[in-house]
Each structure stands twice: as structure tokens, then as C-alpha cells.
């Protein structure tokens, strides 16, 4: 199972809001909704977030052994 809770902490540490992701960085509300609900997103989305936040995938998601 995907857990995007590290993303919200990283965004807070970098001073970037979800609103800014939508307005300034062209993220769709659907993508943010998927992240909020711990659903799958594309590797491209993970890459874009890593480049934007200057971080690694470990800073935005963790994978657990819990069933989806």
C-alpha cells in the first residue's frame, strides 16, 4: 500500500501549499486527491514532485505491506 504522508510533511517543511501545487505548478486536483487518498500515481508525478521539492521518493512516499 502506498502512504503519501511523508509528502505532506515535506511540503510543509518546504513552505509549499497544495494550492500552490495547483496554481503555480499545474498539478491537477485529481492528482492531489489521489495523493490524499493514498492511491496510485504515475512515476512521472513522483519524479516531478522530487524535482520540485529537491528531495528523494522516500521524502514523499512509503510503501507498506498492508493490502491495498
Task: Please report, for each region that a protein language model flagged, where it lies by residue.
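The alpha-helix within a helix-turn-helix
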Residues: 11, 22, 50
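Short alpha-helical DNA-recognition segment
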Residues: 15-33
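Helix-turn-helix DNA-binding elements, focusing on the entry/boundary residues of the two helices
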Residues: 18, 43-46
